[in-house]
Amino acid sequence: YLDDDGTSVEPDYYVPIIPFVLVNGISGIGTGFSCSIPSFNPIDLIRYLKMKIHSTMSVQYSNMGNLGSYEFLPYYEGFKGSVTKIDTHKYLIKGAYEVISDDVIKITELPIGTWTMPYTTFLESLIDNVDKNGKKLAPIIKDFVSLSTEVSVDFTITFPRGKLNELLSTKDENNIDGVEKLLKLSTTVSTTNM
């Protein structure tokens, strides 16, 4: 421990029991290099480390997204959306919404890294729909109400008649429906830059 005027304070260096870079995640840029590591569930990491210590599992160290037969998914404490593996090193992260009526949905979670204030601006741009030349077009959404707080997401969005059913009927190869695509309720995270 370090000494501060005769008082023992913090350790000279810290050796964590679990790899906190995998718990907290990291995203950074250095001179000529970058690194992006998503957060992983500490319970899964501890479980894996215990199995590794007790040699109950053999592992080929290919990447942190897939250690042998033990699968790690990106994890965000309190996130109510979904995380799905879509490729060897790629994960789809979706926010959450529910259909309230024929033309109304309620968004209760945004994708990781999307904040409510910029999202409100994005929704306003869908109401004030203009083309690249500034010509006014028909609004993509009719109206929205935000009751979001610093700790919760709550957007109620009203679509023009029939638009919601049209959006719900389309899905892409990653099972992203038209609502999620239009309202940017999905994003991807990769483990190829660790």
Regions found by a protein language model. Name each.
Residues Y1-M194:
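Intrinsically disordered, low-complexity regulatory segments
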